[in-house]
Amino acid sequence: MEGESSRFEIHTPVSDKKKKKCSIHKERPQKHSHEIFRDSSLVNEQSQITRRKKRKKDFQHLISSPLKKSRICDETANATSTLKKRKKRRYSALEVDEEAGVTVVLVDKENINNTPKHFRKDVDVVCVDMSIEQKLPRKPKTDKFQVLAKSHAHKSEALHSKVREKKNKKHQRKAASWESQRARDTLPQSESHQEESWLSVGPGGEITELPASAHKNKSKKKKKKSSNREYETLAMPEGSQAGREAGTDMQESQPTVGLDDETPQLLGPTHKKKSKKKKKKKSNHQEFEALAMPEGSQVGSEVGADMQESRPAVGLHGETAGIPAPAYKNKSKKKKKKSNHQEFEAVAMPESLESAYPEGSQVGSEVGTVEGSTALKGFKESNSTKKKSKKRKLTSVKRARVSGDDFSVPSKNSESTLFDSVEGDGAMMEEGVKSRPRQKKTQACLASKHVQEAPRLEPANEEHNVETAEDSEIRYLSADSGDADDSDADLGSAVKQLQEFIPNIKDRATSTIKRMYRDDLERFKEFKAQGVAIKFGKFSVKENKQLEKNVEDFLALTGIESADKLLYTDRYPEEKSVITNLKRRYSFRLHIGRNIARPWKLIYYRAKKMFDVNNYKGRYSEGDTEKLKMYHSLLGNDWKTIGEMVARSSLSVALKFSQISSQRNRGAWSKSETRKLIKAVEEVILKKMSPQELKEVDSKLQENPESCLSIVREKLYKGISWVEVEAKVQTRNWMQCKSKWTEILTKRMTNGRRIYYGMNALRAKVSLIERLYEINVEDTNEIDWEDLASAIGDVPPSYVQTKFSRLKAVYVPFWQKKTFPEIIDYLYETTLPLLKEKLEKMMEKKGTKIQTPAAPKQVFPFRDIFYYEDDSEGEDIEKESEGQAPCMAHACNSSTLGGQGRWII
């Protein structure tokens, strides 16, 4: 067997990173290895003084040297390669390298099919014809790798012969010093993996070489690293491979500076198997990186590797010493783990990332120290995973290939964070426990670079933009939303343009003015061109029908199932975004307000009330009332939530709770309650007066102190806050207070006359029906009740409305099913003749004539409205109110007048 192997030619495919050459000769390798071993021995025996002197002389000469890689690692590897070469040749035709995962089969044509069945299935089998002579059977590759190695054969032979001719001690020292100077120049530009080769300073200022570890495991890990790099080299484009080769050369030829300016050579390990495995694994790893990385990435990787290995360490006195190699087992395993993850990184890197590294990038070698803290974490993680088998490692690589396509596009340095927890271990183990200032600076620079480039490479989040647009549309369309999105139009200009359509617009809130300027001004101009006035108040039947038609048309246009989904989108969270997009796309505001001459927001409120499935559910039961009280005690005045819980509209529950919130009296009002009501209404009316009105009244009082104060008619029944009145009365709700005040006001405006009793009542009914028939309106909302009040007398409009409601309910059958014109026609044609006949009979019986109703007054003396029937009862109320001043028409209330001491109206 030994004789046959001596006839084999050496076919050694080596990675481009280390530039190991493919040599085809028989006798030179053994001789070469003996010479290297002898030279390295002589170098160790030289004195430090002689070395320092020779370094200073030869330094300038070697600056122009064409050598681009150091032969130190070559000598170390070749010196140890001869010890166990014969043992490996004694292997039979079959051989398995567990670390590299490749089974080598040396067979001839006869025993090609005689492969044993018990061989592992997760390794590659390579068949080599025995007719081809081989000297190193431990360096087989797949056919794909052999083709790549042969492509570099001519180039490798030329470089190998060139190095062999210049191999001696003098050139070794010159190369070391030259690489040391080059490393100093390129050190600030090197990337994070340059930090793997930190050196320690000796006590005398001299940095010496650490003895190479003689442990098998460490050599295995280095060998694994080289094999993985071969994989990377196969997948890399040419540009990236060139850059990676340059980086590897600089890394291998890194010398160290000792205390006395000496540059001792690196001591090669004496173990033959360790050297071989180191070479094989590094080359394999380089090939695997080449498989997964583009040209630009390989260029940067090789440059970074060269700079890493050629980094010198300067001692206290300027000497350069070799890198001390740790002799610990764990550190060697960290190198192995690092090589495996370099292989994983090359496979998993997406194309978009690969294109981001045109030159000088170190995707496979810069990962370990992108962030110092992550590297420390990875150091701990690798300790727990260092004993995993080769089978599990290969499985993880396969998974990485599958999952590599699912990665999102990260920033340049975010790719490194995927593996820095493992790859950083090798750098941290070789650097030692103490951190270096240079390392901190490098990490800081990388961190800042990462922060700057991450936003640029991060893809835009389109889903987030869509959700933001939907939310803004919801706020824009929601009836309960605030006015934060109102336009910043000039308030004065908006008021001036809107006053043409709404005379009292300046009295509205600023947010309301801006909203109407934005949403309604153009619509108002269109209605003006058509001759239609803008309306407020209760919707007419015609407007309700038009609104219903607009909603149905919009549902048909968009395909939304129901009006409840359209107007109460929050009740359907799963379809909320879709409905909101449809509203925005088909201009919901324009469709819903078509042909309705009202502000858009009032139209929207009316639509919500009309199409609310929880509205119009009839009277509240006792159980509903108790639930309402319970939910209000828990949620407060959150009427929207309470309405959803009791299946009622928010307006309905708010109105009902105002009636049952506390114990209220029913039936006839007592005198004390009546006085409280009069006082409360008076305070609320005076509180509402503007400062300008107060100044005008004050000036009139100063001119004529004896004059009687008066109050405008409309202020007695318009704009009163009945909620405040209810709070002051305490024993009645706001509806009871409003009804009772209308009764009191009518009596005092008519000076106590009974205008709707007996013959006067018949006369008022006849006059009311005739007036309603004359105005010829289509809906009750079109009636001017202020003007119609003159048909009865000097009464408030609400009094007339009450009498009309009573009239149609008594005289018109099924009035709920009739329109307003139909009701008026029935009253005029059927009821009016009967009422006139009855009135004539009564006049004949009593012998009196019909009295003409009194004309309405526009101004009333204040004391004619706000007074008490009995002053003694007022004194009793004063005692009951614990010192509160009674409200009398001729009394003086300084607190109400703001210190003026007079009633102001």
UniProtKB/Swiss-Prot annotation:
Biased composition (Polar residues): 410-419
Keywords noted in UniProt: DNA replication inhibitor, DNA-binding, Isopeptide bond, Nucleus, Phosphoprotein, Repeat, Transcription, Transcription regulation, Transcription termination, Ubl conjugation
Region annotation May be involved in interaction with ARF: where it falls in the sequence: 498-886
Gene3D superfamilies given in the database record: Homeodomain-like (1.10.10.60)
Main localization (coarse): nucleus
Compositional bias (Basic and acidic residues): 1-16, 24-33
List of residues that carry Phosphoserine: S65, S240, S403, S478, S481, S487, S872
Subcellular location: Nucleus; Nucleus, Nucleolus; Nucleus, Nucleoplasm
Myb-like domain location: 612-661, 661-745
One Gene Ontology molecular-function label: DNA binding
Region (Disordered): 1-33, 151-443
Cross-link Glycyl lysine isopeptide (Lys-Gly) (interchain with G-Cter in SUMO2) per UniProt, renumbered positions: K700
Single GO cellular component term: nucleus
Pfam families: Myb_DNA-bind_6
InterPro entries: SANT/Myb, TTF1-like
Domain of life: Eukaryota
Composition skew (Basic residues), residue ranges: 163-174, 215-226, 270-283, 330-339, 385-401
GO process annotations (BP): chromatin remodeling; DNA-templated transcription termination; negative regulation of DNA replication; termination of RNA polymerase I transcription; transcription initiation at RNA polymerase I promoter
UniProt signal peptide: none
Residue numbers of Phosphotyrosine PTMs: Y476
Residue segments, region N-terminal region (NRD): 1-223
Quaternary structure (record): Oligomer. The oligomeric structure enables to interact simultaneously with two separate DNA fragments. Interacts with BAZ2A/TIP5. Interacts with CAVIN1. Interacts (via the N-terminal region (NRD) and a C-terminal region) with CDKN2A/ARF; the interaction is direct. Interacts (via C-terminal region) with NPM1/B23.
UniProt name for this protein: Transcription termination factor 1
Species of origin: Homo sapiens (Human)
Gene symbol of the encoding locus: TTF1
